[in-house]
């Protein structure tokens, strides 16, 4: 049995200077909102926003470009739509504590009536980290932080009180109400394709894996590596939805 291909649309928010420049920020948001509702009317399965704080480095005169924050804008799009799934491609794990992110995700799942997909990754845009005062840890540390974050988020979404102590993060008797509408929790999409660490996190935590760059041949290779990680922990490789 073959699965139906699902289609998602990245909604303009300013990342590549993709909002009209001759109108107010409010009108720019309304432009993006209208595209989101249009996508829903055309039966797109999902809409997505990028989680960055600065426009792409390819944008000229970035100080002149409107660029909306991901989670705030996605909450507004959740209210403007009724059935389309909503997600981040992908949330930067470094920008919010995992306990706060769990609370934000549960709230957005309630606002949207159970339509959240939590897209998350390690983060990579180093100049953005520097501009906003975030520590840019080595890749291996960022991946391990992501692993701990997903442990915390999953616990807070599924347990009345959650406790966890790792190397980088800890919570004690953390309560997350409202709990997510989706059970056992909203789908978790993990972006990234590092073979030793990131794909191991995908195998452990992800309901969906996003492979964002590369040729079909590279995708095939990465999937073979992901399958190996799944086999190591007894995870069904086919239980992870693949996205590009």
Predicted regions and their residues:
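Internal, glycine-rich beta/alpha segment that forms the wall or movable "lid"
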Residues: 2-5, 61, 88, 94-205, ...
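A cross-domain feature marking catalytic cores of carbohydrate-active enzymes
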Residues: 9-13, 51, 88-90, 120-122, ...
């Amino acid at each position: 049995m073959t699965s139906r291909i699902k289609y998602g649309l990245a909604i303009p928010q300013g990342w590549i200077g993709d909002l009209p420049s001759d109108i107010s920020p409010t009108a720019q948001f309304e432009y993006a909102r209208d595209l989101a509702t249009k996508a829903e009317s055309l039966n797109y399965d999902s809409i997505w926003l990028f989680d960055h704080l600065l426009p792409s480095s390819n944008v000229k005169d970035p100080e002149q470009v409107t660029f909306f924050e991901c989670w705030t804008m996605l909450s507004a799009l959740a209210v403007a739509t009724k059935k389309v799934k909503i997600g981040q491609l992908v949330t930067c794990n470094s920008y919010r504590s995992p306990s706060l992110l769990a609370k934000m995700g549960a709230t957005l799942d309630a606002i949207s009536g159970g339509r959240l997909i939590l897209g998350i990754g390690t983060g990579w845009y180093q100049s953005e980290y520097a501009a906003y005062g975030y520590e840019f840890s080595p890749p291996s540390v960022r991946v391990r932080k992501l692993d701990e974050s997903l442990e915390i988020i999953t616990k807070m979404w599924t347990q009345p009180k959650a406790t966890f102590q790792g190397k980088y993060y800890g919570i004690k008797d953390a309560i997350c109400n409202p709990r997510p509408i989706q059970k056992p929790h909203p789908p978790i999409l993990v972006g990234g394709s590092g073979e030793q660490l990131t794909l191991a996190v995908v195998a452990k935590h992800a309901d969906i894996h996003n492979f964002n760059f590369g040729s079909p041949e590279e995708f095939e290779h990465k999937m073979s590596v992901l399958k190996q990680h799944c086999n190591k922990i007894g995870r069904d490789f086919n239980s992870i939805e693949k996205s590009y």
